[in-house]
Amino acid sequence: MLVYYLLFVLFVTISLLEDRLTPKAKAQVLFLSGVLLIMFAGLRSNKVGADYKTYEILYQSVQRSSDLFTHPLHTVVSSRLEPSFLLLASFIKAHFNDGIKVLIFFYAIMGISLKIKAIQKISDYKLLSLLIYFSGVFFLHDMNQIRAGVAIGFLLLSIPYIIEKNYKMFFFLLLIAVLFHYSAIIFGLFFFVNNKKINQTVYLLILVIPIILCLLKLDVISLLCKFEFGIFSEKMRAYSELQKIAHSKINIFNFGVLLQIIVSLFFIMNAEKSKNKYAVILTKISCFGVAFFYLFSSAPVIAFREFELLSCVQIFLIPLSIDLVKPKVFAQLFVIVISLAYFLNQMLINSIFGPYSTFF
């Protein structure tokens, strides 16, 4: 487990260079960090991460490409897997022996490089964003929930097109994201929200009302299951039935959600003061992440999927506190402390990773 902590120390050290490096040097640091993380995630063995063995099973269940194209619609619907995974797995299976390693490495390249590119494009504090990405997102989405990890990369890259009102590029990237993970479909609503101003009262209610409904045990998922949304309805019904069988409980005030509530509240009050043109839309996405968590809490898998999908904007949002908190050193310390809390939450509380090892 020591290697995880050494990596965290490395990225904290890198973040301390935020004000000391030129933009070109920062771009080089981001590139090298991306390569390091791709190798770290892509070369891991099946003993690292809770989902690796699940992906081995899914990979073995996928038909070869010749069979897949015979009845594509039936295959997608019956498998309940996204088309991208079916296509990639079937292609790799047809061309590589022990192809699961190739598949995992490919997802690492895609998921990590897309997020590094998004940091380069969106963040004003790139090295601090890199630290938040490593401690709060990398382990969960690029070493565990890898399909969602790639989808998130495309969604983050779509955010500039919300500001530009470029619907073609936004919905093109959204479509690709959905092909990697169906939960990404919910991101489409953010194209239509006001990205210049934030109504503080409305967004406070967006945070508070779902919490009240959750405490009153209103089952929003059961209501949605009464409507027909194609394969999305199938997913919701499957998760709802699974919840009834498993009787699993959800901690509605877990660390990640509480932190996002605090961050969202801070930026509801301060987003318009930020110099960053993405601050308002990032704040709204963060607020909806909390709202969906509580609205969908009757089906924990869906609640966490949507929350984790939308909470990835914290990569950009948390470092923006540097613009708003004085003196600046306190804000930088705040970002590092938050990253430490994220990291320890992944390592000690979630406990989904064993000691690191490679497959060779």
Which residues fall in each region the model found?
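Alpha-helical transmembrane segments and terminal signal-anchor/GPI-anchor hydrophobic tails
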Residues: 53-56, 63, 86, 191-304, ...
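Transmembrane-helix motifs of polytopic, lipid-linked glycan transferases
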Residues: 105-121
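Membrane-embedded helix bundles of polyisoprenyl
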Residues: 127-145, 149-156, 183
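Short hydrophobic/aromatic helix or loop-helix immediately within or flanking a transmembrane segment
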Residues: 53-61, 68, 73-97
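Membrane-interface transmembrane helices that cradle and orient dolichyl/undecaprenyl
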Residues: 155-169
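Membrane-interface alpha helices of multi-pass inner-membrane proteins
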Residues: 138, 169-193, 294
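Transmembrane-helix signature of polytopic, membrane-embedded enzymes
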Residues: 24, 116-135
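Membrane-water interface signatures at transmembrane helix termini and the short loops
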Residues: 143-150, 155, 180, 268-325
